[in-house]
Amino acid sequence: MRYVDEYRAPEQVMQLVAHLQQRARLLPHTAARPLRIMEVCGGHTHAIFKFGLDQLLPENIEFIHGPGCPVCVLPMGRIDACIEIASRPGVIFCTFGDAMRVPGNNGSLLQAKARGADVRIVYSPMDALRLAQQNPQREVVFFGLGFETTMPATALTLRQARERNVDNFYFFCQHITLLPTLRSLLDQPENGIDAFLAPGHVSMVIGTEAYGFIASDYHRPLVVAGFEPLDLLQGAVMLVEQTIAQRSDVENQYRRVVPDEGNPLAQAAMADVFRLDGDSEWRGLGVISDSGVQLTPAYQRFDAEAHFRPAPQRVCDDPRARCGEVLTGRCKPHQCPLFASTCNPQSAFGALMVSSEGACAAWYQYRSQENEV
């Protein structure tokens, strides 16, 4: 299949690995202190483990896993608020499948469904809007989450709801923005991040120019990369070349999909419906400044929290779990004491084990046979 198979060709992968090994000899980094490349996308993390790319790297280069999975950073209190709304009579609560099993303090949405709440999996926000139109006597809530990748679809759905004057449709907002998160990571002392592989999907919307501050303010190289083995390895080569040349630039490996200016139509829809306002809590990371997303005044009537007024929930993460350290690249999934025993895909303790794009779920699926210390 064009654009898939040609980016997985084993002989080309091994040629690129050999080239990477050769160029890595020119790096000042060693096995004891490798060049630490953070991939900031759950899709990248999954691909790295699936294809074993981290095991093909030179010993002085290391992939570390960042907070690029929106399901993985869902705070427990937000799940509890969703359960409270979903459990009310007359409510149909809709969300994506990955969010169903994320544990809150009072269980998960899947467990709420088992207790009798009308919780349904949808594949797009438009599915939830259609449910609202088909059930005018019910209140339908769509739990929208994700980075800028999914925000345009939510924005277009809310535009449709407004144009059709649907008055029983509500939106519980858990959209978050990527760039403040990267700034927050880099502001942490001794963050240990030398370079970034930026997510292709988010970049398709926001473009590459939005990352300029990472190069100019923090002097870190960044490459926007695709999701196939050759994409990721080529992205690593580009970062190595920047490091050798002592450059800090934003480069685009994924030009077949990502224009430097992004998607202006998607950006316009987002600006119409959403505003960046205030701080947002991230599971495992705490509160991140300026990462919150709210509805603009024209769409306030669809705000589920304003309509249902769930009790404010602030739940602290269990200190036994090391989710925050995994999300910031400070430890590997298997180094968490709960990994595979208390926390596994069948009985997830943390959100990183729930989503297929979570670092812990990917490690469990592809590396659980390894007994690393």
Predicted regions and their residues:
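Metallocofactor- and cofactor-centric catalytic cores in central/energy metabolism, strongly enriched
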Residues: 1-137, 151, 155, 159-164, ...
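Structural motif
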Residues: 92, 139-141, 195
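Phosphate/pyrophosphate-binding betaalpha-module
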Residues: 143, 147-210
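A conserved active-site cap/scaffold subdomain adjacent to cofactor or substrate pockets
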Residues: 172, 190-259
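Internal helical hairpin/lid segments
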Residues: 234-325
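Hydrophobic alpha-helical scaffolding
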Residues: 6, 72, 143, 147, ...
